[in-house]
């Protein structure tokens, strides 16, 4: 009898997990699946709360806002979830004295340079593949998008340098955002629209609390505590209609994971869980170790993860398990919806120049000094923002101050022409308020942005100065 049950246990064990190879396959496939499709989890669930074929944005940006990772307060936002599968949309952009930029992305956050220009008012028709542009109204500029489901983001600058003086155009930028309209072509022509076509209209402005859902924190906690639940949610996102077309290699990965996961048993779940958690470790490690000699993290290829970046219509996803796939996911984890390097350069620091993690426990804080020749070359502006350690969101502070920028009113230069930014919990004695960036009591990180990079920032050779601990 004992021998019978020993044999039965062996047979059942082999049926549940026939070989070590199957366990390894579950682990590696899950690891590659998560690193490949990680951005889709974010965009699938974020866009389910977004306005479809209509621009929208928060009434203001404060630490309550958690919707997008590494949000900043130096521009005014308007965003639309585009679904062109039923009807093109007519986008009307008014004139404004404020500078603004346009960003168009797919659900992976791959960037598509459409013909929709920055700083150019007009009426544009956005249409997807399969639509005949000859059917569009005359005197409207047609803009073809490579796929039907994309995200459109406008960023309007609050300040503008005019004759050497920074002009506050916050009100004008907000008016510009509110006056943009997006409607289906049928409504534009005064026709009855098919059922299910979003009506569109002017930009909708929502209270910031609407954007409080912390997607990054949710993803991080799910992977750490319930990776199987995260995998099920990721499967739902991957199978969503807005997922861009897959290359044969990526499609095989998706189908192979689905088959393994569907036939797995409870005894096999640890391999899937371990694969998901290892993928998350790879994603975070890639970002946090992508540093230069002064401990600033910087990527020069943001948005260009596909095999054919010069032709988005022929774009295919990076190979499963490749460094590009991991990099794309790491950008989603730490600086979602980032511009490409030509539009904006990003430098992110979690450590000071001595390789010690940034921590605001010591009240003396830190200083970042740009020599006159080390200021980021820019045609728009540069800014420095402090963030919380895990969610990468704005730091709550009594001053309601979240950045120091080249346009900050009353920003003071040192006698030699350099600029020092002081990072501390409270305004240090003798420091001009404009040069102070509030930080939390405990770990934090800072991001330097250059909108419209020039010279050595644009060519990728610029390295920001060290962050120094004040002693």
Predicted segments with their positions:
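Positively charged n-region of N-terminal signal peptides that target proteins for export
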Residues: 1-4
């Amino acid at each position: 009898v004992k021998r019978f049950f020993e044999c039965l246990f062996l047979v059942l064990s082999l049926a549940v997990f026939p070989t070590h190879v199957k366990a390894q396959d579950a682990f590696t496939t899950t690891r590659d699946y998560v690193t490949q499709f990680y951005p889709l989890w974010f965009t699938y669930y974020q866009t389910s709360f977004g306005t479809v074929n209509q621009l929208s944005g928060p009434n203001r940006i404060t630490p309550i806002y958690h919707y997008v990772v590494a949000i900043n307060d130096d521009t005014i936002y308007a965003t639309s979830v585009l679904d062109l599968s039923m009807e093109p949309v007519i986008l009307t952009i008014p004139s404004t004295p404020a500078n603004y930029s346009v960003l168009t992305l797919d659900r992976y956050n791959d960037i598509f340079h459409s013909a929709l220009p920055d700083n150019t008012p007009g009426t544009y028709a956005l249409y997807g593949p399969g639509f005949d542009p000859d059917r569009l109204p005359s005197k409207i500029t047609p803009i073809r998008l490579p796929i039907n489901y994309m995200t459109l983001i406008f960023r309007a600058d609050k300040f503008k340098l005019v004759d050497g003086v920074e002009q506050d155009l916050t009100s004008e930028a907000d008016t510009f955002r509110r006056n943009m309209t997006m409607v289906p072509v049928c409504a534009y022509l005064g026709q009855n629209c098919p059922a299910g076509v979003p009506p569109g209209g002017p930009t909708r402005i929502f209270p910031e609390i609407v954007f409080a859902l912390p997607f990054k924190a949710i993803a991080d906690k799910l992977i750490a505590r319930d990776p199987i639940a995260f995998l099920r949610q990721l499967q739902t996102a991957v199978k969503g209609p807005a997922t861009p077309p897959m290359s044969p290699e990526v499609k095989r990965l998706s189908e192979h994971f689905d088959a393994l996961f569907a036939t797995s048993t409870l005894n096999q779940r640890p391999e899937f869980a371990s694969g998901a958690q290892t993928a998350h470790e790879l994603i975070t490690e890639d970002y946090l170790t992508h540093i230069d000699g002064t401990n600033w993290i910087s990527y020069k290829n943001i948005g260009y993860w596909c095999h054919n970046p010069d032709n988005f219509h022929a774009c295919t996803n990076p190979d499963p398990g490749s460094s590009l796939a991991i990099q794309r996911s790491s950008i989603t984890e730490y600086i979602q919806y980032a511009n490409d390097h030509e539009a904006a350069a990003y430098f992110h620091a979690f450590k000071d120049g001595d390789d010690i993690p940034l921590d605001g426990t010591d009240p003396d804080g830190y200083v970042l000094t740009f020599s006159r020749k080390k200021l980021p070359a820019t045609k728009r502006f540069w800014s420095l923002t402090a963030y919380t350690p895990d969610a990468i969101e704005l730091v709550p502070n009594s001053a309601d101050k979240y950045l120091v920028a080249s346009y900050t009113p009353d920003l003071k230069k040192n006698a030699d022409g350099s600029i020092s930014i002081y990072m501390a919990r409270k305004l240090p004695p003798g420091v001009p308020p404009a040069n102070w960036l509030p930080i939390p009591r405990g770990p934090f990180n800072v991001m330097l942005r250059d909108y419209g990079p020039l010279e050595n920032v644009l060519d990728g050779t610029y390295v920001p100065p060290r962050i120094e601990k004040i002693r």
